[in-house]
Amino acid sequence: MRVLGIETSCDETGVAIYDSESGLLADQLYSQVKLHAQYGGVVPELASRDHIRKIVPLIQATLKEACVSPQEIDAVAYTAGPGLIGALLVGASVGRALAFAWNVPAVPVHHMEAHLLAPMLEDQVPDFPFIALLVSGGHTQLVQVNAIGKYALLGESLDDAVGEAFDKTAKLLGLEYPGGAMLAHLAQQGDPDRFIFPRPMIDRPGLDFSFSGLKTAAALTIRANHQDEQTRCDIAYAFEKAVIDTLAIKSERALEQTGLTRLVLAGGVSANEKLRSKLSVIMHERQGKVFYARPQFCTDNGAMIAYAGWRRIQEGSRSDLSISVHPKWALSQ
């Protein structure tokens, strides 16, 4: 089965084709980072308009890359939420129209479920159940995954998502949007002993997160110190270390509470090398295994939507022709 996947939840237009026998056949991605950088964040109206401009050429390029004709597509999967409503409607409308024109099923996909499944695109599929740590610009969640579509939320951020905290702190350090990856690069040159930031909520029971206080601690430190290059590196190191330690502590706590030995790391922040390394060490010590995707499949992309669509079809998921999107959509719903 060949599934065309469409991703337009925020500021990336992604289109891909996944073949259930051959794997990923084609993957095209257009990023709007340069468009939004001058505003310091995503402008929803501009994002929607840019998706409209790029989506059809990307679909054509994807079909060409895969050497596949429309008649050889068996289903169309598209992101139905969560995300920016205008951006979601672009992908949903095009996806539905193509499915109708090609007389194939249309499959709405939950964006965070697609992130959760992304490591399985190329790696072995972990046995159920397992713990998933979902870390992105809009979400920070610990989820027990019992089967496709059967999710139990164990903990989540009570305020800022971890990716949002990275980007906001990067902005305070004078880095361009999106600054999370730049902050991680600065941190490589940081002095590990100069600043120490709090690890939020690790002394409380439960698996929820909070990053607003950590962001405030970073902001106060930035204001209190001269902003030479080394100081910026030192602050970046302290911030990143605090975030990674917090995520690792909560993840290990989730594993202990559930007795599980498999951990999936997914979402844009899962591309962070120090986070990957930290969790790999923890899972090795626990005689378990951590799964994560290649960096290119950690951020938003069409490949994860195509794959998630195929997995949903295997579970019997189908949809009518109505165009329905969900800007807010709990994974457990």
UniProtKB/Swiss-Prot annotation:
One of its GO terms (molecular function) is iron ion binding. InterPro entries: ATPase_NBD, Gcp-like_dom, KAE1/TsaD, Peptidase_M22_CS, TsaD. Substrate binds at L134, V135, S136, G137, G138, D167, G180, N272. It is an enzyme of class 2 (transferase). GO terms for cellular component: cytoplasm. It catalyses: L-threonylcarbamoyladenylate + adenosine(37) in tRNA = N(6)-L-threonylcarbamoyladenosine(37) in tRNA + AMP + H(+). Fe cation binds at H111, H115, D300. It is found in: Cytoplasm. Its main location: cytoplasm. HAMAP family: TsaD. This is tRNA N6-adenosine threonylcarbamoyltransferase. It comes from Hamiltonella defensa subsp. Acyrthosiphon pisum (strain 5AT). The lineage of its organism: Bacteria, Pseudomonadati, Pseudomonadota, Gammaproteobacteria, Enterobacterales.
